[in-house]
Amino acid sequence: MSKVMIIGAGGVGGVVTHKCAQLPEIFSEIILASRTESKCKAIAEQLDRPISTAQVDADNVPELTALLEKERPSLVINVALPYQDLTIMDACLAAGVDYMDTANYEPLDTAKFEYSWQWAYHDRFKEAGLTALLGSGFDPGATNMFTAYIAKHYFDEIHELDIIDVNGGDHGYPFATNFNPEINIREVTAECRHWENGEFVETPAMSKKASFTCPEGVGTYSIYRMYHEELESLTKHYPTIKRAQFWMSFGESYLKHLEVLENVGMTG
């Protein structure tokens, strides 16, 4: 059993906290921390077991380090904004705490994300005897594990890899994102990159469209090629890959609203 600190009290933070609370044999103590502690308390009230909450500015390394040193968790699960990955990693190094996140770092003022900034921490975490587990959501995360599994158990080499992210549900809203709206819009409107013969090739955002029929009667969906961070890590660790692409489905209503936001200058 161990103590975990979850940083971030948005939609993803709420889901992570609920899941950790269901596993007391693994997470014996939970601390949920955010810049706005009232959001943490609102999540805590929904749970079947008590957890602690705290206020912290994840951009402030000394403040976060002090909280980590006070609480001494075994692990930090970072589900704050990707802009804050590096400061949280710095605080974990200073306090001697293992680190996990679900999305790689991107600068606040530039819609560009890549692993180089976080991979640069590798030696420091290794020398400190700490673990930093990056991209541990579904995509990236589960998609990486699926790839590793088939590479180990089914194929001698992987030459082409297509990751297709389809949401088979319908929440009924004309426009709503599944995670932080700002990050979602930045991701969708960024230049597309896919791996082709040893290098990344850039194409305009959402310019490549295809139709995909999901198995088990889920349905047929329009999918669009876009860049996603696991393409960077998978092509690094599986050098036999000649082509790697990431695709995501979007409904017509979502695309219509996104176009309006672009036309009025709210996505740049």
What are these regions (language model features)?
Residues 29-31:
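Short beta-strand element of Class I
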Residues 36-38:
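Helix N-cap at the beta1-alpha1 junction of Rossmann-like dinucleotide-binding domains, i.e.
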Residues 103-130:
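Rossmann-fold NAD(P)-binding glycine/threonine-rich loop
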Residues 47-60:
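Rossmann-fold cofactor-recognition segment
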Residues 58-72, 80, 84:
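Conserved Rossmann-fold cofactor-binding substructure of NAD(P)-dependent oxidoreductases
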Residues 12-15:
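Hydrophobic/small residue at the entry helix of a nucleotide-binding pocket
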Residues 152-268:
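C-terminal catalytic/substrate-binding lobe primarily of soluble NAD(P)-dependent oxidoreductases
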